[in-house]
């Protein structure tokens, strides 16, 4: 049931609002139905449409430039500066818009390690946005509500549109972080991922700057012997899918911290998974998690409420959010210890990288700072086919600091712990076909269980990665060498060189070398 406590929101500038405070998942589900803002799928999940925006809008993400951020944030096309005065005026407009409305307030927190707990209060215009916050943030006990004090405030108003000429935004929608006032202000977009990624970006600044902790855009799980594995990768590369392993306990699927005390903790209390082409056979854990309490976004259903996950009429970026306990085998407390294996997941649009290769510490640091992958259809506005990109730290869109800052921290962690680092291509081979999920799982299982420790390896030309020549459970051993999937071997060599050159060009264009250590530079391709 909802909490009986009355919550005053006047202190935020919201006047005469009807406040629905700390509603349960069932109540928010019913509110969404009653207001005709969603429909119930046959699975019991609520299905909603996020409106005009079905993905993040990176060009409309801003950080207030002030005394805390001006000399620390890596300003540019990713971290776009916003004037403090403009923020204050826009905030006043948003809270005036929410005044006299029925609004929803949820209190939760991020960072599962108690030492790093950060309280989040989320104020939303819509009930399903509040259900998203309930699903995605860690849940607090009712006994904590009376003494709850937020460290960050999220204000989410999809129905409010900015006036770019007056408000300083690019267009009507915006997502702005203010590190002095600790407010994430979101307007003009109903895409729920802006709530999640706003707080993720905030932690990606605060944890390294103030808490000496490495934030990571990754999933993580734990084996039966307590061995932690980390999976880095951009949206659509397989983080959520590959970390949902029936033989391992899930710590989390997207955002984690790696502490000086050698813990790896989940930031979140839920999962936000892509569901395009989802089947119970391919991804049984995720499929089973879609039940009452979950939110399906922008999917197509028949008149009986059965979802057709193959349909992308609205967007390629169909999604589900659900609380982590919808997954059967989760790690108690969402905390693990130093990882034994790290996997960099990349979608190689060139089709030249092998399905798995082992990296030296230097290569790992270089690959991490480079963050090569392809933007997969639907995850951002306007992306309909895979496009080559370099997203530093496998999550540049959410990283306020210079990539070298994060790269330095990861390199130190790798050296301290001796962790194995693997590059996994979940994208194309030479036939422009994706490696099957079954084969990718077999490769990762082999790495996790030590079955790749004593096999023969060969070097990938130019890059120098170690490529295993055999792997138990893979349907066709020949695919382990990416060259074998190309009919034209000369074209393979040319494309491999072209990709290597693009790595070097990216490093030069972004001036990464200026902040990178000699170890990182030693991991570059040898042209």
Tell me what each language-model feature is.
Residues 1-147:
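N-terminal accessory targeting/assembly segments
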Residues 242:
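Hydrophobic positions on the alpha1 helix immediately C-terminal to the Walker A/P-loop
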Residues 239:
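Conserved lysine of the Walker
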Residues 151, 158-208:
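Charged, amphipathic alpha-helical linker segments immediately N-terminal to NTP-binding catalytic cores
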Residues 3-42, 52, 217-234, 245-246, ...:
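Glycine-rich, often acidic-flanked micro-motifs
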Residues 106, 213-220:
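A short glycine-rich, hydrophobically flanked beta-strand micro-motif that places a catalytic Asp/Glu
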């Amino acid at each position: 049931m909802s909490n009986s406590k009355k919550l005053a929101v006047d202190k935020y500038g919201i006047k005469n609002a009807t406040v629905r405070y700390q509603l349960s998942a069932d109540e928010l589900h019913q509110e969404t139905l009653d207001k005709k803002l969603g429909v119930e799928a046959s699975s019991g999940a609520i299905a909603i449409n996020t409106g005009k925006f079905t993905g993040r809008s990176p060009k409309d993400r801003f950080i207030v430039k002030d005394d805390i951020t001006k000399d620390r944030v890596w300003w540019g096309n990713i971290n776009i500066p916003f004037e403090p005065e403009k923020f204050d005026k826009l905030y006043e407009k948003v809270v005036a818009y929410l005044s006299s409305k029925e609004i929803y307030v949820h209190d939760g927190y991020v960072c599962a390690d108690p030492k790093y707990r950060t309280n989040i209060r989320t104020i939303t215009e819509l009930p399903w946005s509040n259900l998203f916050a309930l699903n995605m943030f860690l849940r607090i006990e009712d006994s904590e509500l009376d003494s709850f004090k937020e460290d960050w405030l999220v204000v989410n108003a999809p129905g409010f549109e900015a006036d770019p000429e007056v408000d300083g935004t690019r267009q009507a929608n915006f997502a702005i972080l203010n590190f002095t006032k600790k407010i994430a202000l979101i307007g003009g977009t109903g895409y729920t991922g802006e709530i999640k990624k706003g707080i993720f970006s905030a932690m990606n600044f605060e944890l390294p700057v103030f808490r000496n902790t490495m934030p990571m855009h990754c999933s993580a799980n734990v084996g039966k012997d307590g061995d932690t594995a980390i999976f880095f990768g951009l949206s659509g590369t397989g983080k959520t899918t590959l970390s949902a392993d029936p033989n391992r306990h899930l710590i989390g699927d997207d955002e984690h911290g790696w502490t000086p005390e050698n813990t790896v903790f989940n930031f979140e209390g839920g999962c936000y998974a892509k569901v395009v082409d989802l089947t119970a056979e391919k991804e049984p854990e995720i499929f089973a998690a879609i039940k009452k309490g979950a939110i399906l976004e922008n999917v197509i259903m028949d008149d009986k409420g059965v979802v057709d996950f193959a349909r992308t009429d609205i967007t390629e970026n169909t999604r589900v959010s659900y609380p982590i306990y919808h997954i059967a085998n989760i790690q108690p407390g969402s905390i693990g210890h130093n990882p034994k294996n790290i996997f960099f997941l990349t979608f190689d649009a060139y089709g030249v990288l092998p399905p798995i290769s082992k990296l030296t510490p230097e290569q790992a640091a270089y690959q991490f700072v480079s963050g090569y992958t392809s933007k997969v259809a639907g995850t951002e506005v306007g992306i309909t086919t895979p496009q080559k990109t370099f997203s530093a730290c496998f999550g540049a869109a959410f990283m306020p600091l210079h990539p070298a800052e994060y790269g330095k921290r990861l390199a130190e962690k790798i050296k301290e712990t001796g962790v194995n680092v693997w590059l996994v291509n979940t994208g194309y081979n030479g036939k422009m076909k994706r490696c099957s999920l079954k084969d990718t799982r077999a490769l990762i299982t082999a790495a996790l269980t030590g079955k790749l420790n004593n096999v023969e390896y060969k070097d990938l030309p130019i890059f120098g990665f170690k490529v295993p020549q055999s792997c138990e459970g893979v349907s066709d051993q020949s695919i382990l060498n990416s060259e074998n999937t190309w009919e034209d071997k000369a074209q393979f060599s040319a494309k491999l060189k072209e990709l290597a050159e693009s790595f070097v060009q990216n490093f030069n264009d972004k001036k990464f070398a200026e902040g990178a250590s000699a170890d990182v530079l030693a991991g570059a391709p040898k042209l």
